[in-house]
């Protein structure tokens, strides 16, 4: 109710939405402002990567849901189609970038950007469907929230696994870590389980 009493003009809503997009888009991170995340994960210790992936990235998604949806509804509807295209680019293009990585932490970091693309896709589908199909909009919002929760759990588990591998081999490169299943079969099973969950 408080948000609806603001009586913002469309131009004011658009400016506020752009400010939210800059702040929350960098925090999620959205393509093309995602470049800080892989370097942050590579430089961070395992515990830092776990906290960053499981909690801190979700702040951007929470901010979009909590503030953008109620405050900038009209501007969000206006820009939703463009943001859906950006989200789809993030999902497809960044998945190929992740596939090319040799460092395991960078691989998971880039896959996180692609997964957050699904979150922004769900949020902006809500804007796109408001008024025309409310049940589909609710499904989009629920999907975005479930994706944030599942990504937080799965990526945190993968960064823990990479930390264990690094502790034993002193390398995060894929080429240096062949044959782990021979020495740690249960751990390898768990890591494959989390990798399959990460793939969707």
Language-model region placement:
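Hydrophobic transmembrane alpha-helices and their helix-loop junctions in integral membrane proteins
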Residues: 1-200
């Amino acid at each position: 109710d408080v948000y609806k009493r603001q009586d913002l003009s469309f131009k004011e809503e658009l400016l506020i939405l752009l400010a939210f997009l800059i702040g929350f888009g960098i925090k999620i991170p959205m393509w093309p402002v995602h470049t800080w995340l892989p370097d942050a994960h590579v430089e961070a210790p395992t515990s830092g990567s776990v906290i960053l992936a499981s909690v801190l990235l979700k702040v951007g998604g929470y901010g979009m849901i909590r503030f953008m949806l109620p405050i900038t509804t009209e501007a969000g509807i206006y820009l939703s189609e463009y943001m859906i295209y950006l989200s789809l680019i993030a999902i497809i293009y960044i998945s190929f970038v992740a596939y090319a990585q040799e460092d395991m932490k960078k691989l998971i970091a880039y896959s996180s950007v692609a997964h957050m693309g699904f979150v922004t896709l769900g949020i902006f589908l809500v804007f796109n469907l408001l008024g025309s199909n409310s049940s589909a909009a609710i499904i989009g919002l629920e999907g975005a929230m479930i994706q944030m929760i599942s990504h937080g759990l799965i990526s945190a588990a993968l960064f823990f696994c990479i930390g264990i591998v690094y502790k034993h081999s002193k390398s995060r490169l894929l080429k240096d870590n062949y044959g782990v299943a021979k020495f740690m079969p249960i751990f390898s099973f768990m890591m494959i389980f989390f990798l399959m969950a990460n793939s969707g």
